[in-house]
């Protein structure tokens, strides 16, 4: 069984750059094994929203910490970015912080790409997935250190080389919400990323079997794949506070279709704020009792996930980190 790891999700949509760095430093001080960050050009909420650049944040945190594993959860290397430039950026960070950096990738959302110049109708999943696969292949060729000519359907390189590359390249974690990408993660990913709160059947009957199927098809051991889940948890001894803390993150409760099609934070905020608190809270583990919280988290370990990254919705993140260290972490470590 893969090693159990506990991580912290740095909420880039909620906090300004300096505070976001300090929270990751605090996460290491409170015993977390990893810290991940989303890569949004625009946040999901216009009022009070933030969107610091993920790679600047990773470098700043890397300089301030000693052992945290740092990565994106997730970045889309296929539209507003050239994947070759992303490969260069992560190779540099991999050299600066050896064995502490991974690249988490996904297929993308219109919210981040339309504003930065993508023209035409937002591509359907088939094209976005094809772009992702091609970009991962391109980046891995560059991380070999060789001189690369690449002529793909979407990207091209001519005599390209990255001169500073960490030994072994950069681990790529692939985010999936369905079995097709999960199978690809099992076949080609160093890690797999999913999110909590979507019903047991998704994990036990679709995602995890697909990861195993992909690994088997590539003659790989699934134990060698870091299986990460971003767990949405609002834990506080005050039940009312635990519930109301979820309000800021109402956009998470919009449907996937809504989130993928809306390209304006103002419109996203308007749609999200129309939701009742009860619907918003359904995406979260809302708990005031530590044993209840750990029982709900523990099911994901039972289902085969080993790297638990905790996303807390409240504005007082230091309170969450203190409560996590005292109330939840000792119980969670025993699950491993």
UniProtKB/Swiss-Prot annotation:
In which residues is coenzyme F420-(gamma-Glu)n bound?
A: 39, 76, 107-108, 112, 177-178, 180-181
Q: Where does substrate bind?
A: 195, 198, 259, 283
A single Gene Ontology CC annotation of this entry is: cytosol
Q: A GO BP term, please?
A: carbohydrate metabolic process
Judging by the UniProt lineage, the source's domain of life is Bacteria
Give the Gene3D superfamilies listed for this entry: Luciferase-like domain
Gene disruption: observed consequences = Cells lacking this gene display a strong resistance to PA-824 and CGI-17341 (a nitroimidazo-oxazole).
Q: What's its catalytic activity?
A: oxidized coenzyme F420-(gamma-L-Glu)(n) + D-glucose 6-phosphate + H(+) = 6-phospho-D-glucono-1,5-lactone + reduced coenzyme F420-(gamma-L-Glu)(n)
Q: Which GO terms describe its molecular function?
A: coenzyme F420 binding; glucose-6-phosphate dehydrogenase (coenzyme F420) activity; oxidoreductase activity, acting on CH-OH group of donors; oxidoreductase activity, acting on paired donors, with incorporation or reduction of molecular oxygen
Regulation of this protein's activity per its record: Inhibited by citrate.
Report the pH profile.
Optimum pH is 6.5-7.
Q: Which UniProt keywords apply?
A: Carbohydrate metabolism, Oxidoreductase
What are the catalytic residues? Answer: 40, 109
Q: What is its EC number?
A: 1.1.98.2
Entry-linked InterPro entries: F420-dep_G6P_DH, F420-G6PD/mer, F420_G6P_DH-rel, Luciferase-like_dom, Luciferase-like_sf
Role of this protein = Catalyzes the coenzyme F420-dependent oxidation of glucose 6-phosphate to 6-phosphogluconolactone. Appears to have a role in resistance to oxidative stress, via its consumption of G6P that serves as a source of reducing power to combat oxidative stress in mycobacteria. More precisely, is likely involved in a F420-dependent anti-oxidant mechanism that protects M.tuberculosis against oxidative stress and bactericidal agents.
Tell me the subunit arrangement: Homodimer.
Q: Which family does it belong to?
A: Belongs to the F420-dependent glucose-6-phosphate dehydrogenase family.
Q: Which protein, by its recorded name, is this?
A: F420-dependent glucose-6-phosphate dehydrogenase
Species whose genome carries this gene: Mycobacterium tuberculosis (strain ATCC 25618 / H37Rv)
Name of the gene this protein is made from: fgd1
């Amino acid at each position: 069984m893969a090693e159990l790891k506990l991580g912290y999700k740095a909420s880039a949509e909620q906090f300004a750059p300096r505070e976001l760095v300090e929270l990751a430093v605090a996460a290491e001080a409170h015993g977390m094994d990893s810290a991940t960050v989303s890569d949004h050009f625009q946040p999901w909420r216009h009022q009070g929203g933030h969107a610091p650049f993920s790679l600047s944040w990773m470098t700043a945190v890397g300089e301030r910490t000693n052992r945290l594993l740092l990565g994106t959860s997730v970045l889309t290397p296929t539209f507003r970015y050239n994947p070759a430039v992303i490969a260069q950026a992560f190779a540099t960070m991999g050299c600066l912080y050896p064995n502490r950096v991974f690249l988490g990738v996904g297929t993308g959302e219109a919210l981040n790409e339309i504003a930065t110049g993508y023209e035409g109708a937002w591509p359907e999943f088939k094209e976005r997935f094809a772009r992702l696969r091609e970009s991962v292949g391109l980046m891995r060729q560059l991380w070999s250190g060789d001189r690369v000519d690449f002529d793909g359907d979407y990207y091209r390189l001519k005599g390209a080389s990255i001169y500073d590359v960490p030994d072994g390249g950069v681990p790529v974690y692939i985010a999936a919400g369905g079995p097709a990408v999960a199978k690809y993660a099992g076949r080609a990913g160093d890690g797999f990323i999913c999110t909590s709160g979507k019903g047991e059947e998704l994990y036990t009957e679709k995602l995890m079997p697909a990861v195993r199927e992909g690994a088997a098809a590539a003659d790989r051991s699934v134990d060698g794949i870091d299986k990460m889940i971003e767990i949405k948890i609002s834990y506080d001894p005050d039940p009312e506070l635990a519930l109301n803390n979820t309000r800021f993150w109402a956009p998470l409760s919009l449907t996937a279709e809504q989130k993928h099609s809306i390209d304006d934070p103002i419109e996203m905020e308007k749609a999200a704020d129309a939701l009742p608190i009860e619907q918003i809270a359904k995406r979260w583990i809302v708990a005031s009792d530590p044993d209840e919280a750990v029982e709900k988290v523990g099911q994901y370990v039972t289902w085969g996930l080993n790297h638990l990254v905790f996303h807390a919705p409240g504005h007082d993140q230091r309170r969450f980190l203190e409560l996590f260290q005292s109330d939840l972490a000792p119980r969670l470590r025993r699950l491993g």
